[in-house]
From Swiss-Prot:
The chain crosses the membrane at residues 3-21. Negative regulator of FtsZ ring formation; modulates the frequency and position of FtsZ ring formation. Inhibits FtsZ ring formation at polar sites. Interacts either with FtsZ or with one of its binding partners to promote depolymerization. It is a single-pass membrane protein. Residues 22-564 are cytoplasmic. This is Septation ring formation regulator EzrA. Residues 1-2 are extracellular. Belongs to the EzrA family. It comes from Oceanobacillus iheyensis (strain DSM 14371 / CIP 107618 / JCM 11309 / KCTC 3954 / HTE831). Its main location: membrane. Keywords: Cell cycle, Cell division, Cell membrane, Coiled coil, Membrane, Septation, Transmembrane, Transmembrane helix.
């Protein structure tokens, strides 16, 4: 019984699902049916008929026939095929062949979309034709007065166009011919060709307007301005030659002739109404003319510079040479008393060699001023470079003079430092004597002897002849280091001795109470009397710290307070 019920329920479910799926297919069929009816109801035929009233020919007639044929094919062939597909889909759905029905509907949907695309193309092309016909009429209304205005401008300014006037006249006639061709195409109904023609004509007129506007200036520059400028450069060249300026090396004469020939060729090109690249070439020539003027101006400035500065240049070389010679004599005298470092002497001799080179260059400069082989600009560069070198030589010479002057200064400073170090050793000796300590350890006397010996070495070096300041500085440095170390060791020794006395005195309060302490303090006192202050301090400090921890620190602090 349960099985039967299950089977019945399964059948009901299957039927229900089938009915639902079939209902969906029916809905899709209805949708495509409405879509098809909507397409059939559109006024495409009416849109096509709008141009039927026009007098058509040529490509426009071909387009009309093509659009008409496309629409008729859609109405008579493609849409009826859609109807058949819809019947097939319903039939498949009635038989519950859902997959086939869906495939048929999918194919039908694609065909309807393709039809929509075709209709859209037809309507767009129709609209393009109608709008182009209107647009071309509007543009012709603008073109005609433009051509008249261009003719008027040409007529009133013929002299500005020279022989090229014929070219411009001919071009305007061609525009009139193209307008007539446009009218013929319109009258015969070939609107598409007429529109294409008017668009081309519009672009040509725009280019022609620009050419007419630019042409007078280009012609004037090519025929008048630049030839005149080149003649002026030639005249300037000749005048500068007569005045003694060196301009031959520029080679401008040949270059100007080349440009004059180039301008003649450009004039022939312009007379044909062709200004292609002419402006660019004229700009290049004009730029080169500017460069020529700058070069000639530079040569004139250079000549004036040389006339004014060469006497000053000669004087500067003579002065630096005389200064060098004076310093050389001074150095020779100085070397009798002092040793001058080889590096310093090499730098000094290099200055002399450079001065000799400048003298030779000056002789060569005078020759070149007379032989007319080098331009004044090149000679100016030589003189300017020479002035720079003289300035450098003056700086180097001044540095060298300071270095040799420092020899005497360094000697005096060394002697003063030696006196100061001797005074320090004397004061240290007095300090030891006033300290009332039992005696001085041997290593302290060794330090004293070393410091004294180092001072003696400074004296010996100072007495050398010629005096070597580098050796003096080295000996002085070693002596100072020895004195500083002696000073440091004496201060440490005295501090240790004073602190040891303070510790022993402080520990005496416990001496009678602590037998062990008494023995340790006696050892510390023995070491103290034998000048072994560091060991004595260690013994005394250790002994008092065992009795009273922290006592050493308090004693040290008290001693620091007293020293202040």
């Amino acid at each position: 019984m349960v099985f039967v019920i299950s089977v019945i329920l399964a059948i009901i479910v299957i039927l229900t699902i089938g009915l639902i799926l079939r209902k969906r297919i029916y809905d899709k069929v209805d949708h495509q049916e409405k879509w098809k009816m909507d397409i059939m109801a559109r006024d495409v035929a009416q849109q096509i008929s709008k141009i039927k009233s026009l007098n058509l020919s040529g490509e426009t007639q071909e387009k009309f026939e093509l659009w008409k044929g496309r629409w008729e094919h859609i109405i008579t062939k493609e849409l009826p095929d859609i109807e058949d597909h819809l019947f097939d889909a319903e039939d498949a759905a009635d038989k519950f062949r859902m997959k086939r029905a869906n495939n048929i509907l999918t194919e039908g949907d694609q065909k309807l979309q393709n039809i929509e695309v075709k209709i859209e193309e037809i309507l767009e092309e129709l609209d393009e034709l109608l709008s182009s016909e209107k647009t071309s009429r509007e543009e012709v209304a603008q073109i005609v007065p433009t051509i008249k205005l261009l003719r008027k401008t040409l007529s009133q300014s013929r002299y500005q166009y020279g022989k090229a006037e014929k070219f411009f006249d001919k071009k305007l006639d061609e525009f009139d011919t193209q307008l007539a061709t446009y009218e013929d195409n319109v009258e015969s109904g070939d609107y598409l060709e007429a529109n294409r023609l008017i668009q081309v004509l519009k672009e040509e007129i725009a280019e022609f307007e620009i050419k007419m506007e630019q042409f007078p200036e280009i012609l004037r520059r090519c025929k008048q301005d630049l030839p005149s400028q080149l003649e002026q450069v030639l005249a300037g060249l000749q005048e500068m030659k007569n005045d003694g300026y060196r301009v031959k090396h520029f080679g401008f004469d040949k270059e100007i002739i080349t440009y004059q020939d180039q301008l003649k060729n450009l004039q022939q090109q312009i007379e044909q109404g062709d200004i292609t690249d002419v402006s660019t070439k004229l700009d290049e020539i004009e730029e080169r003319i500017t460069e020529m003027y700058e070069s000639l101006e530079g040569e004139a400035i250079a000549k004036n510079y040389l006339e004014q500065r060469i006497p000053e240049y000669e004087k500067s070389i003579s002065e630096i040479a005389a200064t060098y010679d004076d310093t050389k004599l001074e150095v020779e005298e100085l070397q009798k008393a002092y040793f001058v470092e080889n590096n310093d002497m090499e730098r000094f001799f290099t200055i002399g060699k450079t001065i000799s080179t400048l003298r030779e260059q000056l002789k060569e400069l005078h020759k070149e001023m007379d032989d007319d082989q080098k331009s004044h600009s090149d000679l100016q560069n030589i003189v300017e470079d020479g002035f720079d070198k003289i300035e450098q030589l003056e700086e180097q010479h001044e540095e060298f003079k300071k270095s040799i002057e420092n020899l005497r200064k360094d000697e005096m400073e060394a002697r003063e430092k030696l006196i100061e170090m001797r005074r320090q050793l004397y004061e240290l000796n007095r300090k030891i004597k006033k300290s009332n300590i039992p005696g001085v350890p041997g290593f302290i006397w060794t330090r004293f002897e070393t410091a004294s010996a180092k001072n003696s070495q400074v004296v010996d070096v100072l007495e050398d002849y010629p005096l070597d300041i580098a050796k003096v500085q080295h000996a002085l440095s070693e002596a100072k280091q020895a004195v500083d170390q002696t000073h440091e060791q004496i201060d440490i020794m005295l501090d240790q001795a004073y602190l040891t006395e303070q510790v022993i005195q402080y520990a005496n309060r416990y001496r009678s109470q602590q037998p062990d302490l008494n023995g340790k303090l006696k050892e510390a006192e023995r070491l103290f009397r034998n000048y072994e202050y560091e060991l004595s301090l260690e013994h005394a400090a250790k002994a008092i710290e065992e009795i009273e921890p922290g006592a050493l620190k308090r004693i040290e602090e008290n001693q620091l307070t007293l020293n202040r």
